[in-house]
Amino acid sequence: MNDWLKYEKNGSVVTLTMNRPDIRNPLGEPEDVINFEEASKLVNDDRDVRCVILTGAGKAFSAGGNVLHILNIA
C-alpha cells in the first residue's frame, strides 16, 4: 500500500481509505489499479477478513474520474 490507499485491519474488518482529500479522492491514475489489486490480494489471502469497507478521506467519498489525468493522456 501507499499513502493514497490506506489499509487498516481491525479484527475481521478491513478498511480501505482513499486518501487524496484535497482533490476529493479521484480515481484514474495508473497506480490506483495496482493499489487496489494489492489490497485485494491482501484481503483474499487473509482468511480472518469478513468485511471490507471502502471509504474516502475528507468531505467526499470520490469525485469520480481524475479529469486532470484524463486530459493529460487524451
Where are these regions (language model features)?
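Conserved CoA-thioester-binding segment of acyl-CoA-metabolizing enzymes
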Residues: 1-57, 71-73
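Short, flexible, mixed-charge acidic loops at enzyme active sites
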Residues: 64-74
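Short, active-site-adjacent cap segments at secondary-structure transitions
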Residues: 59-63
